[in-house]
Amino acid sequence: MNLTQDQAESLANATNALSNENAAMAKQVGEALKRYGALGQVAGLTAKQTAAMAATLIGAGAEAEVAATGMNAFMRTMTKGGSMTDLQKAAFGNLGFDAKQLQKEVQKDAPKAIFSVLEAIKNKLPKELQMQYLTAMFGEEGARAMGPMIANIEKLRENFALVADETKYAGSREKEFAARAKTTSNALT
């Protein structure tokens, strides 16, 4: 992901804070980042936004590998533009999106584009068509990971907000270490 030492430290603190706010361990989020992080940045997400997305997916029940593969399929499709298949273009078009415009929007503001697509699927389609559209748009791998995201849009929004404000997570690893060091079991060893 080509991060400086300070950026890596900040990402580690953000990942730790995300693990404290989600049913995802920092190790799992880190594994998803290792698999997908660099591609997320190419697709328009920051490393911390990618971590937030991974934490949301893992918290919704996805394994780290499934989360990484699903994010890859999801973001790769969103950045295809005119290279989308006819089926993908039709599915996005039915929801009011133009493939080339969406490609530009992802690069301009990836979280906004992600929310607009997820909310369109959730709000414009009956539940029985949502997985069908997710599969048509993002393939089996993308649909498998992103299906649970539809039900967790607000959690994703909270996670993006958390990583957007470094004051919310700065030093979180050190604080957690200090808290654990004060426990009775640690004091006895």
Give the role of each language-model region.
Residues 1-21, 28-38, 46-189:
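Alpha-helical architecture feature
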